[in-house]
Amino acid sequence: MIRFAIVAIVLVVAVGLNKLLSKRTVQAPTQASPSMPTQIDRKDFSEATKDWLVLAFTSSSCNTCADIERKAVVLESRSVAVDICEYTSHREMHKKYAIDAVPTLLIADAQGVVHKGFLGPASATDIWAALARVRDGQPDPHEGECS
């Protein structure tokens, strides 16, 4: 009888410990995703009087950044300013706008409101089309989609 009681107690303790430990499972860590600014101060960048700003945050060690720079500079016009903020020479701007991934390309209006942004590689067609849409006041057909 005593053996049965000891076995029952050990069994109850084992089941209790199992339930307690199974509740303490470690959740997978949440990965922060890179974010883009929604507002910028146009005075921080060249030609603040133009209607639009195409702003590329880049790094000299990034091959994709060089491609984005080439695609951005051709957008400059009478109403569109283009500014390239390379990390080593504009580190303070990367910190101010919390740029944590490059290339980041933003299209902002005269008040500094960011209407469209690209994180990572983007085609020239997509960048041109995005600028045309925001200048014409058209909604982004891909807004809210995950890619």
Sequence positions of predicted segments:
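N-terminal targeting signals for export/organelle localization
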Residues: 1-36, 146-147
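Short gly/ser/thr-rich secondary-structure transition/capping motifs
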Residues: 35-40, 84-88
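Local sequence-structure signature of Cys/Sec-based thiol-disulfide redox active-site neighborhoods
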Residues: 44-71
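Iron-sulfur (Fe-S) cluster-binding segments and ferredoxin-like electron-carrier domains
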Residues: 67-81
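Thiol-based oxidoreductase modules, predominantly thioredoxin-like and allied folds used
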Residues: 78-93
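Soluble, non-transmembrane catalytic domains of enzymes that act on hydrophobic metabolites at membranes
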Residues: 100, 105-106, 125-129
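A short, hydrophobic beta-strand/beta-hairpin element that forms part of a small beta-sheet core
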Residues: 103-117
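Thiol-/selenol-based redox modules, centered on thioredoxin-like
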Residues: 122-147
